Design a protein with these regions (language model features):
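C-terminal output helix
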Residues: 107-117
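Conserved acidic carboxylate
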Residues: 9
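The feature encodes the CheY-like receiver
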Residues: 15, 57, 87, 106
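Short hydrophobic/Thr-rich beta-strand motif most characteristic of the beta2 strand and flanking loop
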Residues: 26-33, 41
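Active-site beta3 strand of CheY-like receiver
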Residues: 45-51, 56
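Charged docking surfaces used in two-component/phosphorelay signaling
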Residues: 16-24
Length: 130
């Protein structure tokens, strides 16, 4: 596995935090901030994992998630969804749309890294050998 993440997020502080956390573990992190073109970015970049914010400019993360799950080539893609709200209805909507993992901001470095490793199917030994 190439260990590529596409981070679809519009908050610079969150982008830098996730890039820092994952790059130290050998992940290549590319970013995209516009909801309207996010599905095209996933198709173009072909990541192993997508980290998707709920609140984005021009299109919600829920709509992007539904669009991706509706496409055969992305139906099995690992998608981690982030939200600052953390309400049960958000988690329920994400699960109904086919999210792989749901995480609330703020998150710890270890929470993010463990979630991404789990979605990638990496155990601790493989991740540390990276």
């Amino acid at each position: 596995m190439g260990k590529r993440v596409l981070l679809i997020e519009d908050e610079p502080n969150i982008i830098e935090a996730i890039r820092f956390i994952l790059s130290r573990d050998g992940w290549t992190v590319e970013t995209h901030s516009d909801g309207a073109t996010a599905v095209a970015a996933v198709a173009a970049k072909r990541p192993d994992i997508v980290i998707l914010d709920v609140m984005l400019p021009n299109k919600s993360g829920f709509d992007i998630l539904r669009d991706l799950r509706g496409m055969a080539e992305h139906s099995e893609l690992s998608i981690l969804m982030l939200t600052a709200r953390g309400q049960k209805k958000d988690r329920d909507m994400a699960e109904a749309a086919g999210v792989s993992h749901f995480m609330t901001k703020p998150f710890s470095n270890s929470e993010m890294l463990e979630a991404v490793r789990r979605l990638a199917g990496l155990d601790r030994a493989q991740a540390n050998d990276g």
